[in-house]
Amino acid sequence: MSRACELTGKSVQYGNNVSHANNRTRCRFLPNLCNVTLISETLGQSYRLRISANALRSVEHRGGLDAFLVKSDDKELSQRARLLKRQIAKKQAEAAA
């Protein structure tokens, strides 16, 4: 299981802790990942995802998992999230027709 958000692609960053004397020590900055269950209204199912707390706020701000995935860019999404996005788009196209 990688330390990356499945929806936004946010992952581990590397940098320095800098002391008052300007001594630098390497460190890793880990994303705040949460295991959450999100419900797709279009598909009528719940999906368990490992996403960052920031992504969870974005999902709620955009109005749910379906709206977030439709508006998001494919290159940021994980392979599983891309599959979910395609299923949602297909189901919405069927409902519109």
UniProtKB/Swiss-Prot annotation:
One of its GO terms (molecular function) is structural constituent of ribosome. Keywords: Ribonucleoprotein, Ribosomal protein. One of its GO terms (cellular component) is cytosolic large ribosomal subunit. The keyword Lyase does not apply. SUPFAM superfamilies: L28p-like. GO terms for biological process: translation. HAMAP family: Ribosomal_bL28. Belongs to the bacterial ribosomal protein bL28 family. This is Large ribosomal subunit protein bL28. The lineage of its organism: Bacteria, Pseudomonadati, Pseudomonadota, Alphaproteobacteria, Hyphomicrobiales. The gene is rpmB.
